[in-house]
C-alpha cells in the first residue's frame, strides 16, 4: 500500500505548556478544524477527547501523552498532547524525544510559567524547533505584549510576534498577520465566522512597526535578508516566510501567535503556522544511533522508506480492549502488520500483531507504517519505553531516555487475598507504562512500597489500580526517599576468613573510599597491581560494595555519590571464592562507615509559589518554617513569585496550607532538584524512627 502523505507533507508536533494554559483545549480545536471530531469536548466539563483516562477527566488535567493524527489542507499532522503538571515531566520528556516540532502554549495573563520553563529546557535539550501560541486572549487580564516579554526575560528566547491581536479580554476580536499584512476578524460568540478585513487605521502604524521588528529579528539569523533589509529593498511575503521557516528550524527564532482556543479564534492560523514553520521529518537531522555490538560505531537512520526499518518505542499502555499497546515513532524504513521486528535494546525477536493509528483512545487499523509515522503496535510482549525496534538484519540502538529515580514512597497493602494477586498484576503493568514508577517489597516488613515523582503522581497511580484493575488497597503515609553518603575519605581493610572443617572461605580487600561529586553516583576503580587480588574476583568486590550500599550504613538508606578504589588485598589458592570477596567488600564498607563521616541526605525540591502581594510576608515566613531557603523573588503582573528550595519532607500537605494562607489565591509548583545533607537534629530523629525507638 502506498503512503497517503509524503514525508514533506508530514508534521510530528507536540503541544506543551504549564498546567491550565489551555493545551488540551487547543488540541481539541485542532482536531475539530481538521475534521477528526464533530463535537468539541470542553476540558472543564470533563469531556475532552484527548484527556481520555478517567483520572484525567475527573481532574481536568492531562496525565498521559495521547497521540492523535489529523489532516490540515493536504498535510498530515501527528499530535502528541503532553501533560503540564510537573509530576508528569517524564511524559513530556518521552514525547519530545520523538517529535520534530512543538507548539508552546502560554496563558495570555501569566506568560511564561514555571512548568513552561521546564518543558522549554527539555525541548532545547532535544533540539526541538518551536512556535509559541499565546492562548486565552479573551481572559480577564490578558496581555499579549507582557506574554512576549516573558519569553525574552525568563527564557532568553529570540521570540517575535508574527501576529498582532486587536483588542484583548472580551474585546478581543481580530488578528493581524504581520507576514501577509492581512487582518482576520472573528464574528459571533465563538468565532464561527471569519472575515478578512482592512487593518483598522488606528492599528496601521503599530502593525508596520511590529513587521519591521519581525524582519529585524529574522534578519539576524539570515544574511541574505539582512543585506536586502539594510539596502532598503522590499522583502516579499515568500522571502519573509522562507526566512522565518529557516530560522525556526535552526532554533534561532521562535514565531509568536495569538488567539483563544476556547472561543475558536486563531486556531486555523496557528495550524497554518505549524505547516509553514515547523519541520517535516526531512528537515531535521537524521537520527544517529550506535551498533548493538559496538557502542562506538555510529549508525544513521535516515528518513527514507527504502532504508532499513528503525523505530523508537516511546510509550507503553494497557488498553482494556486490545491489551498492551506500544507507541512508537518510525525514523526509517517501513513495517507491515504481522511481520517480525528485532528489539535491539533487549536482543529479542518480536512479532507485530496489529498496527493502529491512534486518535486519543479510539483507533483505526492500518497495514503499513512508513518513516516519519507515529503509530501503536499490538503484540509486542518484551518491548518497553525507550527500546529500539529495527529490521531483523539491522543492528542499530537509538539513544534511549534517562528517567529520574523516585523521590517519594508509599506503602500499599491489599485489603484481601484476591486483591493481592490483582495488585501484583497491576503493579507490573503500571511499571511497564511509567518508568518513573517503582514498586518493590520491603524485605523486613513484607510491605509493598511504591515510589514516584510526587504526591499527585502516586495518587493517580493508586486511583488507577482501583478503577482499572479493581484493586482495593490501604495506602500508608508518604515517605521520603532519603540517601546516605560519606563526607571524608577513608582507607580501610575488609577481611573475611572462615575455617570450619573442609574448604574454608577467604577474601581480603583494601579499599580507599572518597566522596564523589553530587549526583555522580557510585564509581569503582580497580587499582590492583601484580594480581594480589585475582582478576576473576574483582567484579565480586564491586558487586559486594553495590549490594552493601543499597542498605546504607547510618539508617538503612542507599549510599550514593561515593568513589571506591580497590588498591590492595590478598587471596588463598584454595579457600578464596567470589562469595568470600563479596563479603569482604561489604565488611570494608562497614569499616569505612566508622571513619568516613557518613551523613543522611534528603531530596530538596525547587518550589515556585505565586500569590497576591499582600500574602508575601506569611508565605516567606511559612517557607522559612519549613527549613526552606528563598532563592529569588519577582513581580509577575500584579502578583509575586517566590522561588525557594525546600526539603520534600516539609512539603507534605503544602497545598492545603497555601490555600488557607492565601484564601485560595496562591498556586505553587515543585520538582526535585538535588540531594542535600540533613541537619544533625533531624538526622537523629530519622535514625531513631528507623530503629523503631
Swiss-Prot record:
- State any GO CC term: cytoplasm
Q: Which CDD domains match?
A: EF-G, EFG_III, EFG_mtEFG1_IV, EFG_mtEFG_C, EFG_mtEFG_II
Where does the protein end up? Answer: Cytoplasm
UniProt-listed GO biological process terms: ribosome disassembly
Q: Name one Pfam family in it.
A: EFG_III
Picking any one GO molecular function of the record gives:
GTPase activity
Primary localisation category: cytoplasm
Per its UniProt record, what HAMAP family does this chain match?
Answer: EF_G_EF_2_B
Which protein family is it in?
Answer: Belongs to the TRAFAC class translation factor GTPase superfamily. Classic translation factor GTPase family. EF-G/EF-2 subfamily.
Q: What does this protein do?
A: Catalyzes the GTP-dependent ribosomal translocation step during translation elongation. During this step, the ribosome changes from the pre-translocational (PRE) to the post-translocational (POST) state as the newly formed A-site-bound peptidyl-tRNA and P-site-bound deacylated tRNA move to the P and E sites, respectively. Catalyzes the coordinated movement of the two tRNA molecules, the mRNA and conformational changes in the ribosome.
Q: What is this protein called?
A: Elongation factor G
